[in-house]
Amino acid sequence: MLFNKEEYKQRLKKVQKMMQDKGIELLISHDTNNLNYLTGYDAWSFYYAQCAIVHVNAEEPLCFVRAQDAGGAYIKSYLKKENVIVYDENYIHTWPRHPYDYLVEIIKERKWDKLSIGLEMDSHYFTAFCYEKIKQGLPNATLKDSDRLVNWTRLVKSETEIGYMKSAALISEVGMKKAMEVINPG
């Protein structure tokens, strides 16, 4: 992990505070950058259903991934094993079955199905079909757009994040100086 567990916990607290301010009790974050920001998970498997699920009072988010990606989630995230929720490959390309059928089951099992649920309605990989699965599966929930809640949280950088950004800038500077020394016309 690039960041320590405390960094992720601080991020979670900031997100939960914004959730409270917006009246969101459960957040389903589909944006791959936000999934990484909240959990540390960074696999390139965003082309199929995966998300972070944040309860407003939880100590950790949940990381919802397909079975073939579970190993990466266990290794790359800071989460306890029980907070990595793995759905079976039988949910992949078996129309009309969909991974969000299982997501809905998880939400119901945890008795979160009557909460105010924030969804990233403008996330690239949150399709209309995903939305319909949640809407139909959780008829007693109040669904609302989270208005890029996590994205807005990410704007204010921690000292650790700023440190990484400064290091990256220095590396870029050294690389560009070297490029300028060796570059020639033609």
Where does each model-flagged region fall?
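A composition/biophysics-driven feature that prefers long, compositionally simple stretches
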Residues: 1-174
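C-terminal helix-coil-helix/basic helical segment that borders enzyme active sites and/or dimer interfaces
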Residues: 177-186
